[in-house]
């Protein structure tokens, strides 16, 4: 890292992209999905999702493109999930009758892309200052669970794998059609993919099942990044370190939120700064107590950075989640981010 110190200051975008490429950079980037209301400084990353796919998110809930109803929860600041008990597919063999891709006729893709870029700029993150990542959906496993619920969805994967493949192939074809229409108007700096295939304890499915039923579709989608020579990131919560090799095999460069239930030191030892850990911190244990001190919060940040950022290959990704306006949550997050922006800015000097 030392050779870059003293040179012209890198933008958040430049610093983040250099991190993803395994290159020298000036400070620990903070990975985000995009600017939050009230922010004035550019963020490292803005995640652009085609409006046709995420209009329900922009509206705070409602039907996704497939007809799944998403609802928010107060306790998670309105974060959305499929409405419990209201699933649209109860028999995987009948998916052809239920799952219908929406029409893409008459869409002005260039205007759609520009609206998203303009929104980022209006929030203080123009694309010359903030990287633009391109994402489309929550993941192939997660889409299946959204259609069927976990009980029926997992049974379908075990009992009717060929039907699952056919369904996921169908939705993959749709997503790739959307991507091929809009991605060159977006000109993304990064390709983002997602799939929460794990709990804190372990993946929902075996590695073999993941490689047979889920990975092929991620591989097809990852071609969008490989063909353009841009970094590829994977969002996957939970204990999924046994899947890192699979992700790397299709070109993934980074993993968020890389939770602490994983053997992150083992991942770091194997890949060094060529596979970026974006996380390595969780709001668990003592940090959740009401009397947690400011110093304990700051120490948790320093420990994560000391563990994983020492040779690069690390981005901060973490914070407390609670109801909008929760004062204790805001207090803790303000302390955390202050430490990220002080310790993380001096770590490589």
Q: Can you annotate each of these PLM segments?
A:
Residues 45-63:
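Short acidic, Pro/Gly- and aromatic-enriched capping/linker segments at domain boundaries
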Residues 30-50:
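Short, basic/low-complexity N-terminal boundary segments at the transition from targeting/disordered tails
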Residues 2, 18, 30, 56-57, ...:
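Compositionally biased, low-complexity repeat tracts
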Residues 41-44, 59, 74-76, 82-83, ...:
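Short aromatic-enriched loop/helix-cap "lid" or pocket-rim segments at secondary-structure transitions
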Residues 59-106, 126-133:
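A contiguous, low-structure linker/loop signature
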Residues 1-35, 98-349:
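Active-site loop segments of alpha/beta catalytic cores
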